[in-house]
Amino acid sequence: MSDSDKKPTLGRRPLGLKTAVEAGEVKQTFSHGRTNKVVVEVKRRKLMGRPGEAAPTAAPAAAATPAPTPVAPPPPPPPPPPPPSASRETRQEMQVRLLREAEEARLAALEAANRREQEERLRAIEEERRRAEEKARAEAEAAAAPAAPAAPAAPSAAPAAAQSAPEAAPAPVAEPEVARQPEAAPVAATAPAAPKAEEAKPAAPAVPAPRRFTPVAPAAPIKRPELAAKKPAHPQRDRKTEDRRGGKLTVTRALNEDEGARARSLAALKRAREKERRAHFAGQSQPREKQVRDVVVPDAITVQDLANRMAEKAADLVKALFKMGMMVTINQTIDQDTAELLVTEFGHNIQRVSESDADIDTSADVDPEESLKARPPVVTIMGHVDHGKTSLLDALRGTDVVRGEAGGITQHIGAYQIKTKGGDFITFLDTPGHEAFTEMRIRGANVTDIVILVVAGDDGLMPQTIEAINHTKAAGVPMIVAITKADKPEFQPQKIRERLLEHEIIVEAMSGDVQDVEVSAKTGAGLDELIEKILLQAELLELKANPDRSAEATVIEAKLDKGKGPLATVLVNRGTLKVGDILVVGTQSGRVRAMLDDKGRQVKAAGPSLPVEVLGIGGVPMAGDTLTVVESEARAREVAAYRQERATAKRTAQAPASLENMFSALAAKNAVIEYPLVIRADVQGSAEAIVNALNKISTDEIKVRILASGVGAITESDVNLAQASGAPIVGFNVRPNAKARELIERNKVRMKYFDVIYQLTDDIRSEMAGELGPEAIETVVGRAEVKEVFPAGKRDKAAGLLVVEGVIRKGLHARLTRNDVIVSRTTIASLRRFKDDVPEVRAGLECGVLLQDTNDIKAGDQLEVFEVEMRERTL
């Protein structure tokens, strides 16, 4: 029900408040006979007419507008008829009506939004034209001002027009939508603007055709001043207000209220700005000059990578290579020379680099003469085992190192520095004398300044003494001969000097240039003279180094300590090594955490010729590697990674594969027995010496295969490797840790512990011989000639022999040959002489034999009888 329902009544209705709600009851029926009464209230809907509908006759009032008004837009559609009363509507009809109203409201909002956009567009065009005309007029007035000073009287009509404009503006318009059209803005100030506005009218086809026209007499164009032109237009009525008054507000309508006025997206704004920017620079675009780049080209590079470095298209590079006759793709690798041709052709500069540039080469880095300062000499003591090298060094240092060495022999290279009575410093290197430590002696000879050749006066020149002489000559360092054990009665120094002549070593006592001295480590005789000669030789050499630079050192020995980690005994060649320096040594890098001298004291810096023990290296380096201090950890890691890659490539490098090589390798593998080993030593030099010594005892029948060799305690990985390969673990001065010991006991892995190297080599040699098995030794004891063959029994044949040489015994092995070709290998099963069985027949006698498992016997064959003895093999 609504307020518009007018029912006829006989009398006047009683006074009272009208209720906007009508109540009623609805009976609901459910299953199982249940019912329920619900009170339903129906609210009346209040209808409000749109403004202007109540006074339709006010439309002619628009004729009072003095300015020519463009065609008015069509009036809004009449409001829909009021919906039927709620009491006469079903629920489905109500839903359909609400949906229809919501759809009509949405379409009306969309139409209003389109009209608003069209109005804004027309208004912007009109404003732009107005500004252009004002600018042109201002320029014309400025140009005409000097010629016609009386011209300002012309715009006298402007105030009158300005006065008449406000009177015409507030005239009521029949249609409320006319006030929102762009024509409601002030009329243009100049007459030529009117035809332009008329031309712009057909540009809005989106506006629907008008339903009625307001007759307006064409008025003369009125020239208005700028103030009137800038007067703001009448405030436009908000669409939301009209929507609010336009009937019932529904949920759908409220949610879709702003759908027609959607803002521009961020992407649309970006596209518009980019379009403006391109339009702005369109006239200024000029061909850019090609940028010349410095292109870094390694030894090998792909076409795509080269194109990226040149900032060129990869397809252009491929085309250029095609012109050069090279059919390549962008993923193929080209060499440095081809890359240089491409870089030059495209107008860039090339910078050649090589992978080896990542490495450090200090050989060409020579210190200036003025920066060099005197340094202590480095003296290496070399000689045969048990000739008293360590005892001599103990006498010089005042220590007793010999007593703590296993077997009384030196198996590590030691570095010490002593201070003489005169305050001078001398660095000594003690090298092992055993034949297995050749590499240690070579390293000692290469890093030293002076070599002291120790020869026992009661023993003479031995193999390792001669080897030390050759190493010294190869290193090109001066030599001092120390003839030891002068306290023994068998001491014969003159005999030693004469033996040295065989190796082109002439001592001063025999008019030569090699110094010699007779010493005794037990009594101390000759030690002062030895030190004096060392200092004299060092003075002649003029040993100098630059201490004020980055340090360089040589690794003398390296090991893995359980508590300290990787340790390296280094000898500083030049510069000063300090705590905190970043270093790279071989394939390892790190930072100096601490340094210890030969007495175990911590030092902060180590100058030239000072041996120190360095802590802080990432891994155990190889003995003989060069330690170099670098500027940063990144540089150290780069150098270490490059050296590691190079070492891996060298280790895994193989010869070109061919069928011949494959078959020969397969045959060699089948013919040679391999004896696998896992080796762990206390220091790097000992591990190296053990590997070299074991490789020397390999033969053509059996050879040692080192599965792994390292420094430090035996670990679980070593045990697992040994178990998988069936190899024994050899520990040299090391023991397994707790977990490894448990694995060894559980898996029954063989372990061998040694502390003297020659005991290790002897044991492995006997083990390898046992793998070969006993050796069969054949000894020929007699020969005979077959004179006649006759049958013996049903199948066998007997041979009548004449013993030519030696003796023939029953049960011995025999070879039957015919024309110097072995026919069969057999055994003498029966031996008779004149029908009697005899144990043996000597030379010159005849006999009959029955050979086992063979009947291929002919007259004239030769029979060779031999004994077989099984002996244990030796290597």
Curated annotation (Swiss-Prot):
Biased composition (Low complexity): 54-66, 141-195, 202-221
Keyword presence, Cell membrane: no
Protein location: Cytoplasm
UniProt keyword list: Cytoplasm, GTP-binding, Initiation factor, Nucleotide-binding, Protein biosynthesis
Region G1: start-end pairs: 383-390
Binding residues for GTP: 383-390, 430-434, 484-487
A Gene Ontology term for the protein's cellular component: cytosol
Region of interest: G4: 484-487
Chain intervals with Pro residues compositional bias: 67-85
Protein name in UniProt: Translation initiation factor IF-2
Gene, per the UniProt record: infB
